[in-house]
Amino acid sequence: MIAAVEKDAVPRKRRVISQVSQACIRCRQKKIKCSGEKPSCQACSNNKVECIWPDRPNMRGKKPSSAARTLSPLTGIVQPYLGSHPFSPTILSPSSPNMDFTYSINSFGDYQKQLRLPTSRKLLQLWDIFLKTSYTELFGIFNKAQITSQIASDTAPPVLVLCICAHAARFSQEEVNRFKSSTAASDYYANQAFSLLPCRFQDISLTNITCLLLLCLIELGSCRGAKAWLLLGMALRMVDSLDLGNEINDNPLTMGSNTVSWTEAEQKRRVYWACFFVERLLSTGYMAPSKLRSLSLSLQKTSIQLPCPEPNFLFNQPILTELFDGSLPENTQSDTTSMAPYQRSLQLEFMTGSLIRLSNLWSEISRWALCGGYTKDITPPWLNQSQFHRSFELLKAWHENLPPRAVWSYTNYSAYSSPGESAGACYTFMHLLYHTTLTYLLRNVLDLFPEKSRQKSKLFSSVSQRFGQQPPTVWMDMILDQVITSADFITKLSKDPLNYIMSPFVGFSILTAATIHMLLKFCVVNIDQNYISSSRLVHVDHQILQDRSKYWKINQAMLVTLQRLYNFYRFQYLEEQSLYNFKIPGFPLCILEYGIVEDQSMKSNPDLNSFSKELFSRGTNELLNNGDDTQSGNSTPAMGVSEIRTDTILDEEVPVDPLITSILDDGRWWEEMFGSERKAGFKETVFEDMNGRSIRL
């Protein structure tokens, strides 16, 4: 047997794969071999693509002790910066736009942004404009003395300064001249504020909530309702996180060392009630988010006081105020007898609390009207058991319980509107909201498009058909007198030269009043000649809304609605044969909803019929007298106008742009507002209102 011979163990050669120390980004993504040639590897050269190389990492690194020595001096610098956010002026580059200063903001991490803001003197001017024109919905949220000193010393939070500038620049003539339009001036600062918000969302603070509310109002006025609701929802989520709906201290009047100061607690209350007011003000509309009202905004869960008077907040004078339901906090009821007379006398002498309570009434009434109003009630509205009567009594009770300084009088109005008094905006807006709510409620029982008749009861025909009986005459007269008085008040107050409020809600109030004035002009003036003066106010409504549409896009949409409704009233009630036949009177959504209008001005309707296209192609002079109320130069009715209704025609008419608001310009706008029912042959005759005459007040 042959023995096997053992061979020496020969080590196997190791297979060596040639690798490069670093591969380009494209080869690394495609997982292919990279030749490592620079500036372009072989694979990228063959594919004729750009070869991108990552930065070469530092292989050695630094010692831990060295890193600790480097970061230790910076610890004291980063901590205070997160709270104060100071901004300091730097050198303006020659290529930058013509602005006054450039501010460098070092935010979290390595994120850096360059912000260009005006000088402190210019910021103080914009701050003053903001207090006069835009300090309405958020009245009381700012400590004016603190914000003024921060702006003067360049220590104000930059994002808050940008939000204030975004509101004030819209009404500053200097900023409008610089940016060519009020919208561009506002968007310039608003966009910079939006760019700073993402890096601040991890910091839930009162400043961030305030900025979100300010930007929400800007988006609402710009006809971007969905974005406004998104910003408001984020602010309410921060309110829930901070639990602002509950008192921090056991006793709201104490200022112990273990609790926050009274001024800080009052500031948190004011931020909470500002969120409450904005949410209640914008809660009307079918598209309003139903689940946005968070738990902290529920009145059953709220246990904080209403805001105190403005002087107490500015001068840090603690005072006890009521809760929303009118009661005092439970932990202070036993101490009310020992309170100072000054504190007891001023418990009800505040205006912000009355405005907050009114906003809740507006929210409930608008939601009730949008859900059907009296048509969903089984009790006639003139009976005490009806929801309409209960809402009406709540409004009357609110008005009767106003403190003496908040009651409407020309003396109070002049005192609040004096220079340097910022409470005038709150005082004016409160009474404007009250009469808007009252008009909104009483209008629900009226027929805005009644049948042609000289009987006043025809204005309540829907109520009569709904409950099978005619309303009492006294009740109908009371409703008409109240709604006309409130509508006239809205128009006259909006036109008053002492009123500087530029809130977009004023435009909605004007539109609400204009619906009553158009009803008077075309349907009621023949019934009662006492309403002639009120019917003429529709031209004032048109002028006011036209002026405010220059600043807010949402008011532009309301102006178009007013013009279209005015055209319809003329064509419906001045013709022998009506253009449209109504079976069930109703309300168009455009006069009921506030806060959800989207910008559709740039959208065109591709379904324009050939008749409308032919009409647009014709010159304006060819249609000046076609379908006008009266022939120029005499008092005889124009063709197609009924002689019976000529006594309702005034010498001046609202000028209407036919390319925008003609009843024939868009075949779909009527379906969107009223429904699809119309007469078949209404387009056979051209009806245009293009007289072009100006408004004479």
UniProtKB/Swiss-Prot annotation:
Entries under Gene3D superfamilies matching the protein: Zn(2)-C6 fungal-type DNA-binding domain
Q: Name one GO molecular function term.
A: RNA polymerase II cis-regulatory region sequence-specific DNA binding
DNA-binding region (UniProt annotation): 24-51
Q: Where in the cell is it found?
A: Nucleus membrane
Q: TM segments? A: 500-520
GO CC: one term?
Answer: nuclear membrane
* Membrane topology of this protein: Single-pass membrane protein
Its main localization is nucleus
- PANTHER family from the UniProt entry: TRANSCRIPTION FACTOR, ZN(II)2CYS6 TRANSCRIPTION FACTOR (EUROFUNG)-RELATED
What is the protein's name according to its record?
Uncharacterized transcriptional regulatory protein PB1A11.04c
Source taxonomy lineage?
Eukaryota, Fungi, Dikarya, Ascomycota, Taphrinomycotina
